[in-house]
Amino acid sequence: MPQDKIVIHGAREHNLKNIDVEIPRDKLVVVTGVSGSGKSSLAFETLYAEGQRRYVESLSAYARQFLGNMDKPDVDSIDGLSPAISIDQKTTSKNPRSTVGTVTEINDYLRLLYARVGTPYCVNGHGKISAQSVEEIVEQILELPEKTRLQILAPVVRTKKGTHVKMFERIQKDGYVRVRVDGEVYDISEVPELDKNKKHNIEIVIDRIVVKEGIRSRLFDSVEAALHQAEGYVIVDKMDGSELLFSEFYACPVCGFTVPELEPRLFSFNAPFGSCPDCDGLGVKLEPDVDLLIPDTSKTLREGAIIYWYGKASTYYPALLEQAMEQFGIDLDRPWEKLSEKEQQIVLYGNGDKLFHFLHEGDFGLRDQDMTFVGVIPNLWRRYRSGMSESAREMARSYMTELTCTTCHGYRLNDQALSVKVGEKNIAEFSILSIGDTLDYVKSLVLSANNEIIAKPILKEIKDRLTFLKNVGLDYLTLSRSSGTLSGGESQRIRLATQIGSNLSGVLYILDEPSIGLHQRDNDRLIESLQKMRDLGNTLIVVEHDEDTMMAADWLIDVGPGAGDLGGEIIASGTPKQVMKNKKSLTGQYLSGKRAIPVPEKRRAIDKKKMVKITGASENNLQNLDVEFPMGVMTAVTGVSGSGKSTLVNSILKKSLAQKLNHNSEKPGKHKKITGYEGIERLIDIDQSPIGRTPRSNPATYTSVFDDIRDLFANTNEAKIRGYKKGRFSFNVKGGRCEACSGDGIIKIEMHFLPDVYVPCEVCHGRRYNSETLEVHYKGKNISEVLDMRVSDGLEFFRHIPKIERKLQTIVDVGLGYVTLGQSATTLSGGEAQRMKLASELQKRSNGKAFYILDEPTTGLHSEDIATLIQVLDRLVEQGNTIVVIEHNLDVIKTADYIIDLGPEGGAGGGTILAKGRPEEVAKVADSYTGQYLKAKLEK
């Protein structure tokens, strides 16, 4: 009898307190709770980990060694478990070849569509291309200049791996004596053995001929033989390094432009057959950027306008430039922007073979010689391509920018692939449409009766996948959008759409906040998609804080009551209505409205004279915007997904300020200018990335409070008597740490076919320090015991030590009092890491001149955590600082002093300012989706 629930007994992973819980199968189940309460420990580290482990356990030991080992979660038993698929936010590919089209597999179907029903057109504007006959090929060859020496080649192997021994035997058997292998001509009996793991090109030399009168018959026979051997292809090698490719398939009769046989790999930018030869299918090329080399064009050459040469300790390049320019008659004391274009070109690209005399004594001895001036940019290329060290390459790379490839114009494919159209568009033009427009185009496509039959099953797959993407709120994306530029929420919803398309049933799906980055308007479509997956017969476990998703759930599990050691218990489990009635459940209280984040009684004053102004913002979909960000207040940038929020704030505002304030070399998005930033001293980007990537990093080291604690221990009488200095109490350096475990406190034991096991160090028993160091006590505790304290306990312990007390108080203020001082940074969630960064900022003595940028800080946060976050942000603003936050959460938006709402839609339909002003003013704008939802929130 099939089970109708998943039953967990004795779950103890991380902070879970030996919990028992029953989860109904084939339902939409939401797991919620405050940040750090144990939601992910239950959903991912217990349920998903065990589902995966059981699958891997069913494989052979041989297969398991390639898959890696899965740790068994700390749980007594789990019954009723299905195969598990995790759709989280951590697996976005940063590979530049990965796009929305490749991830969703829509590109595979598109390539098939273009290969089967595409029509080639001449790239030189001569109309449709049809197949060529032998006569047409011969006529084109005879039009070559007289006395042109030719080789007629039959390409029998094109970019295929193997030794191709049988092919050579066949060629010899057919009576041919010469072959060209990978560009080299050999006698058939002297061909070297080929590497079977490399791709090779093999052409039969059919004939060698000189263009002159009376060769038509011989040429006809040779071309016909080549077409026969190579199944429709012939290469005419003009012996001067250039070649012509002809085919019985497609070639322009006017200019000879030839398209190979239409097959799916021709339309792949990841295959040499179809990719642009100049950028190898990336669509961009790394090029030196004059704006980075010369950031201040008002400077003269002598003043160091070219920071690439003047920003170093060496005097060699400044001397080289100045002596060369003086001898070439270029004014060194004239601002760069006032030099003529010819003079600028000489500085950047050199002065050809013209010599100048160079005299310089430096690190490499005396130079006294006549030499050419190669120019700044060729010198930069040389350093990048043949840098003496990785740091030299990196330095050169910092003056370069990825620019659109001038050969394919960013389309990634070669001319042959781009010449093929279905309807009125080639495959690249198809891919740059938004998903919504792509769907409309596919539906309106008119094909011939024959092509309609061929394309019908392919178009169905494409339409289905596009519809799934539209239904999860991603209709503003394009298929050509690089995966690396997607937010965590977007990449997760793409994988969600892919899973819906797979039509699997009986699967346990575990999702991590799929609503991230999604505007309230699009929430309903996401919830419908989740319900559709459930209705296919799947169990969905969603870690989520969004109220709409919680209310739409069949079952709600609230983990708490607090975070860390104060959490790990099931506070409520039932339908949303049952949880709302549970007095112990914080989630229930927020859902029922008994608890709420208040609207501020008054907003902060906005000084119109103190504004950071961006003029002419036009990156991506921004429509030449002029935007003002008021100083000394909190501004929320809002709008539907894809409306241009991240482009405006992260690509333009943040990078422009970083360039002006920190001399950052990263190029901002397109805009005319930025003004009003003179009062800013520090730019701080507070994101959810980890505060440290190794287990050695912890809250005490990150906030630098550990330095003060080590000072305190070094000043105890016992430490002074023993001669211990501050370094004795560090677990990162030799001296005071346990050398058996190098201060880690744990030892890794490799188990080969079983997961690696971490056991406490037998010497220090997990305490990180040697016994001599642990004999030093402060108020009865040694340094290891202090690291094991919760921050809240540490605050009481170090009362009246102002330096330490102040730092620990800020960690408590951001709601992280439950974290231990020595807790590994790798165990902190994104929300916890972000709040730790805020705590670190609160510790600093503020002069009110900091500019903070936060991108969706409510990710992973419960309503109770959001209330704490808002209090922290308020404190930073009260100190006179400025905050700009990208946010969809209405509780944060309603507490902002100023709102900039972009829209009205995503992608090409967005990029304009719909509303700006106080939340109450934005709520009155009927065209603003944010305003509509905000109005309802403010009226509650």
UniProtKB/Swiss-Prot annotation:
* One Pfam family this sequence matches: UvrA_inter
Location within or outside the cell? Cytoplasm
InterPro entries for this protein: ABC_transporter-like_ATP-bd, ABC_transporter-like_CS, ATP_grasp_subdomain_1, P-loop_NTPase, UvrA, UvrA_DNA-bd, UvrA_inter
List, alphabetically, the PROSITE patterns matched: ABC_TRANSPORTER_1, ABC_TRANSPORTER_2
Task: Point out which parts of the chain are C4-type zinc fingers, as ranges.
Answer: 252-279, 738-764
Any single biological process term in GO: nucleotide-excision repair
User: Where does the ABC transporter domain lie?
Assistant: 309-586, 606-935
Which Gene3D superfamilies would you find in this protein's record? ABC transporter ATPase domain-like (1.10.8.280), ABC transporter ATPase like domain (1.20.1580.10), ATP-grasp fold, A domain (3.30.1490.20), P-loop containing nucleotide triphosphate hydrolases (3.40.50.300)
Residues recorded as binding ATP, renumbered to this chain, are 33-40, 639-646
UniProt entry keywords in alphabetical sequence: ATP-binding, Cytoplasm, DNA damage, DNA excision, DNA repair, DNA-binding, Excision nuclease, Metal-binding, Nucleotide-binding, Repeat, SOS response, Zinc, Zinc-finger
GO molecular function per UniProt: ATP binding; ATP hydrolysis activity; DNA binding; excinuclease ABC activity; zinc ion binding
Similarity comment: Belongs to the ABC transporter superfamily. UvrA family.
Description of how the protein assembles with itself and partners: Forms a heterotetramer with UvrB during the search for lesions.
Please report the name of this protein according to its UniProt entry. Answer: UvrABC system protein A
Organism of provenance: Lactococcus lactis subsp. lactis (strain IL1403)
- Gene this protein is translated from: uvrA
